[in-house]
Amino acid sequence: MAKFIHCADLHLDSPFKSKSYLSPNIFEDVQKSAYESFKNIVDLALKQEVDFIIIAGDLFDSENRTLRAEVFLNEQFERLRKEQIFVYICHGNHDPLTSKITSQWPNNVSVFSNQVETYQAITKSGETIYIHGFSYQNDASYENKIR
């Protein structure tokens, strides 16, 4: 049986403008929370020896990504790669696919295009499974992708 983690809406680099009323120490902790959450997800994936992680939209808070976020993700994806854990990313309405995206992820990471795609995965137990998905091209999409 496939063993995986499904997550979404991590919103790395969110400015948390609505939380600016918090004390500086607490506000700093809130700003770190998305990074800590994703690190905890990776830690759990490694501990549970999952086959893959699906990130179903809004990994980033906007289409503009900071170097900090890219370096952090590369480090986390590399930890997963070393244990042969794959990552499938769908971009959401907050972080749509754009020509600005130049990230080069490790070879265990696949990013869905704006068309429905299917990836074939072989689990650690030898089972073949298919993962279907797509990424948002724009911050709003009303197109029915499943027909």
Describe each region flagged by the PLM.
Residues 52, 63-147:
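His/Asp/Glu-rich metal-coordinating catalytic cores
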Residues 1-70:
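N-terminal active-site segment of His-dependent metallophosphoesterases
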